[in-house]
Each structure stands twice: as structure tokens, then as C-alpha cells.
Amino acid sequence: MKKIKKIMAAIDLSDYTCSVLETAELLAAGLQAELLVTNIINPENIETIKLAEQLEHDYKNFFQAVTADNYLEKIKEERSRQLDAMVEQLGMGHISARKIYRVGVPFEQLIWIVKDEDVDIVVIGPKGKTNLSTVLFGTTAEKVFRHCPVSVLSVREKKSDDLRACMFLESKKGQ
């Protein structure tokens, strides 16, 4: 069996994110492997901002100046802040994880990252934030399972019913 040197935690800031992070960190520590934490930004959100940019021209006083570029930067900053808060709250501040943010179709981008980064195993939650798209298209996790060229570990346990509790309100360590 090939030695696991690089582990990718695919997070979407759903209720499973904290458990995915903890599991990936335990694996990385136990195997002395590099940890990548990935988050994909849905392009539909960017398209909405581009539409708002067009409308801004007609409704200058109604919209603040928002561009797709500064929206993308703000989203990356916010998600990075949320991830840092989760890592700290879970008592994982000692880990060194490289963060990767991409824009695109989530399962496609995750597969590209696996190939580009030579990832050995992917840790992912079984579903994301909503079940609406699942009815029509299937979950990102299902597509990753079908198309991923490496092993995929599905974390079934929710850390919390409320992601905010995991990030900010509950102190897991020190209480």
C-alpha cells in the first residue's frame, strides 16, 4: 500500500465541517502527512454579483459599488477567517494546513486539486448545506466518490447541529 503523504479536507462550511477538519487533522498527525484544506466558491454567486454590477450603472444610489473581483476577495477573506476560528476553537491551532480556495463547480474543482496537488486521500462530509440540489443532481460528495482517482473518507458524524456553535459559541477545549 502506498504511504499517505498528503490529505485533503474538502470543507463547505456545513454542519459536517468541524468533524471533517478533526478527522483530517487526526489522520495527518498520525500519518505525519501534509494537510490541505480546500473550499470551493460556487460560480453562481459570482454571476449574481456581475448582474448587480450591471444594475449598479442604472441604480447608482441603490447599490454599493460591488464588483465580482472584490466580492471574491471578501468571500475568500471571510471563509479564511471562519476556518481559522474553527481550527482555534477545536484546539487544532498547532496544525499547519495549507488552504486552497477555487471558484467553480465544486466536485470538478476538488478532482482537479487532487490531481494538481498529488493528494493521497480525501476527507469529506456526506452532504453539504442544502438538500435542494441533491434532489436534481446528487451531492458533491457523491460525485467525488464516483470520479475521484484516490480513496475518499466520508465523515458521517456531525460535530454540531449548528456550525456557528462549533465556530464561536462552544468552547470544546478548556471547559
Where are these regions (language model features)?
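A short acidic, glycine-rich active-site loop
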Residues: D58-E78
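Glycine-rich, Arg-bearing micro-motifs that act as flexible, cationic patches
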Residues: I121-K143, D161-R164
